[in-house]
């Protein structure tokens, strides 16, 4: 049970003078009091006026508004983060809906592609295969000692952009910013890490300013040993840490998760987080449409690790509603670039083979060729839910959506591919093609749609609704693992927060400005599930609630007292 918190008591620190101003976690800038300026040798190093954090945030907001491009806004916010983290999170708290797409998707994709060009200051730990014998030392060198949450990537599959090498570091930095802004986890407890296993991106290898290891990606046994060396070093350094795998290639993501999820508290947000938030959104949409999940027929476009992870979560929840495993799997169909996954297809990956449809069940389908397209599936299977995780734009065509709407009064359509340029269909088109009947959730942010005099808010099926609450629940409960039951509990808790499902109108998911409240609800559900399933000590609900609040950091300055090393 984790009851420690960044308390309101004075903080005793040994740093002073210019060195103190260089610590983002400790720096207050112009908000240092007159007494602190005397005690910490800051006189003359700051303007005369002592400001409040509200005044600092107002200045930062005005400066932010002067920037004309999202990438420049991203760079500006990252500069504040690297200068004064408390101010950074106070600014985010005041303008979360505006700034969330800037610090994370979709703008973070541009930042990853241009990482070496826009690099200003080091943050986190860069572990190169070239120096893999020094991993222990690298973790010891981390400026944060009491790390509780690590987000790690190898940069091979960054969003829909592919191999970005060490540019992938932008993802752990952004993800951990959301752990704090949305889930209240103190930035003092978080650490972004990139495993630099080389890159196969020739453009990066040819770039004279690329800052990573200039070498083709290592694979096979070399790669496995590299990742394992990192995991074992983390276990020795921080044995109770929560480790999140982020943007690993499909061929590595699931094997790494399966290998290590019982060895330390870890999860893969691309697989499990995406699945949890999608299931939560689908549960909410099903309630809004007046159906149980078990009665839906779901078609996926995209059968990678993310799509299959979502499908597994959906079938698991269908089973809790009374379906057998075979019945649940018959109601979830997977389509990839080779067509519908059936037992006749060769060379399927392990996680795909569990989701194939038996060929004999398709004997009455009207087909023109051996390859069963998305159009064929929609016409023959008559789905009520269509989920896109293909990374390919425009594949939910007008013909497909209109065919779906012919047999489904309120189709649920979720084009989840990121960034916006890769979305399978826009919300405006989906609503127009269904005469406003579609229940829509997207992976990227979209403005509300005006259709025939009515405003339709568009839910962003953003993992930020889920993983911060999961992290908070793990820390508060002291869970040693993240189980499937904990993830399903998170999905149900998110659905319970849906304005539309609760009959209040609006979007399928809560307003992003309410995300801290949502994270608390999810944290409680996750912590309870951890206790029920034996991966956390059993305590009262009151104790859990207290632990969640004690772990919920707020961006406020603490009083400082001088001490010696």
UniProtKB/Swiss-Prot annotation:
The active site is at 104 (proton donor), 175 (proton acceptor). NAD(+) binds at residues 157, 270, 418. Disulfide bonds: none annotated. The keyword Cell inner membrane does not apply. SUPFAM superfamilies: Aminoacid dehydrogenase-like, N-terminal domain, NAD(P)-binding Rossmann-fold domains. Homotetramer. This is NAD-dependent malic enzyme. Keywords: Metal-binding, NAD, Oxidoreductase. It catalyses: (S)-malate + NAD(+) = pyruvate + CO2 + NADH; oxaloacetate + H(+) = pyruvate + CO2. The record marks 270 as: Important for activity. Belongs to the malic enzymes family. It comes from Sodalis glossinidius (strain morsitans). HAMAP family: NAD_malic_enz (MF_01619). A divalent metal cation binds at residues 246-247, 270. Pfam families: malic (PF00390), Malic_M (PF03949).
């Amino acid at each position: 049970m984790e009851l420690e918190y960044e308390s309101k008591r004075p903080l005793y620190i040994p740093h002073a003078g210019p060195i103190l101003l260089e610590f983002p976690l400790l720096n207050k800038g112009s908000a240092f009091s007159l007494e602190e300026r005397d005690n910490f040798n800051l006189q003359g190093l700051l303007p005369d006026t002592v400001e409040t954090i509200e005044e600092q945030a107002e200045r930062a907001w005005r400066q932010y508004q002067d920037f004309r491009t999202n990438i420049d806004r991203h760079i500006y916010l990252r500069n504040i983060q690297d200068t004064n983290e408390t101010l950074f999170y106070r600014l985010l708290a005041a303008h979360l809906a505006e700034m969330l797409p800037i610090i994370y998707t979709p703008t973070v994709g541009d930042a990853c592609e241009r990482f070496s060009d826009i690099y200003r200051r080091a943050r986190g730990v860069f572990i190169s295969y070239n120096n893999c014998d020094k991993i222990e030392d690298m973790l010891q060198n981390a400026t944060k000692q009491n790390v509780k949450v690590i987000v790690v990537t190898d940069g091979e599959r960054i969003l829909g952009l592919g191999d970005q090498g060490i540019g992938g570091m932008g993802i752990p930095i952004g993800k951990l910013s959301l752990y704090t802004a949305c889930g209240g986890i103190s930035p003092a407890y978080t650490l972004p890490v990139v495993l630099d296993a080389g890159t196969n991106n020739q453009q990066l290898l040819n770039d004279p300013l690329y800052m990573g290891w200039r070498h083709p990606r290592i694979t096979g046994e070399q790669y496995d040993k590299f990742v394992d060396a990192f995991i074992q070093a983390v276990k020795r350094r921080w044995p109770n840490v929560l480790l999140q795998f982020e943007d690993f290639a499909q061929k590595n993501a699931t094997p790494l998760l399966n290998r290590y999820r019982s060895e330390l508290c870890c999860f893969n947000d691309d697989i499990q987080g995406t699945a949890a938030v999608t299931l939560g959104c689908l549960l909410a949409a099903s309630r809004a449409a007046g159906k149980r999940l078990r009665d839906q027929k779901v078609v996926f476009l995209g059968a990678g690790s993310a799509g299959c992870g979502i499908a597994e979560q959906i079938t698991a929840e269908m089973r809790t509603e009374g379906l057998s495993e075979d019945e649940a799997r018959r109601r979830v169909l997977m389509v990839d670039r080779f067509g519908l996954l059936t037992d006749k297809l060769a060379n399927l990956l392990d996680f795909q083979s569990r989701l194939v449809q038996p060929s004999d069940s398709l004997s009455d389908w009207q087909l023109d060729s051996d390859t069963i397209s998305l159009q064929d599936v929609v016409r023959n299977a008559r789905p009520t839910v269509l989920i896109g995780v293909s990374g390919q734009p425009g594949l939910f065509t007008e013909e497909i959506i209109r065919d779906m709407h012919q047999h489904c009064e309120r189709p649920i359509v979720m084009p989840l591919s990121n960034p916006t340029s890769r979305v399978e269909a826009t919300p405006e088109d989906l609503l127009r093609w269904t005469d406003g009947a579609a229940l829509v959730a997207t992976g990227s942010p979209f403005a509300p749609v005006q259709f025939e005099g009515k405003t339709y808010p568009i839910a962003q099926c953003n993992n930020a609704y889920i993983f911060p609450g999961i992290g908070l629940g793990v820390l508060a409960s002291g869970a040693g693992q993240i189980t499937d039951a904990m993830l399903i509990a998170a999905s149900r808790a998110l659905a319970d927060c849906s304005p539309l499902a609760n009959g209040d109108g609006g979007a399928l998911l809560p307003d992003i400005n309410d995300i801290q409240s949502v994270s608390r609800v999810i944290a409680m559900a996750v912590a309870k599930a951890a206790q029920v399933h034996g991966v956390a000590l059993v305590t009262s609900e009151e104790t859990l609630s207290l632990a969640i609040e004690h772990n919920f950091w707020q961006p406020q300055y603490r009083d400082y007292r001088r001490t010696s090393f």
